[in-house]
C-alpha cells in the first residue's frame, strides 16, 4: 500500500508516475497548492522503473526527515 507523507510546513509528498511506461519518482506539493496542481519531482531521489522502488526511496527519506504519514 503506497504511503504519502506531510512535513511540518504542510508540504505533501507522494510517489507519482512520469512520462513513459516505467518512470516513477517521489514528488512534493507546497502547502499553498491543492489537488493535482503544483507537484514537483524531488531532486534528492532518482527516477525509478517501478512504483515500489520509488516508494522505498520516499519511505527512507520520510523516516530520515521525521515526516508524518498523510492520508490524502
Q: Each PLM stretch: what is its role?
A:
Residues 31-55:
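A short, exposed loop/beta-hairpin motif centered on an aromatic-Gly-Thr core
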Amino acid at each position: 500500500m503506497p504511503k504519502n507523507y506531510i512535513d511540518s510546513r504542510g508540504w505533501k509528498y507522494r510517489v507519482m508516475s512520469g512520462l513513459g511506461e516505467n518512470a516513477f519518482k517521489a514528488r512534493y506539493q507546497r502547502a499553498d497548492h491543492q489537488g493535482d496542481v503544483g507537484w514537483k519531482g524531488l531532486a534528492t531521489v532518482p527516477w525509478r522503473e517501478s512504483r515500489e522502488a520509488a516508494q522505498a526511496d520516499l519511505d527512507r527519506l520520510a523516516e530520515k526527515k521525521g515526516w508524518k504519514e498523510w492520508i490524502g
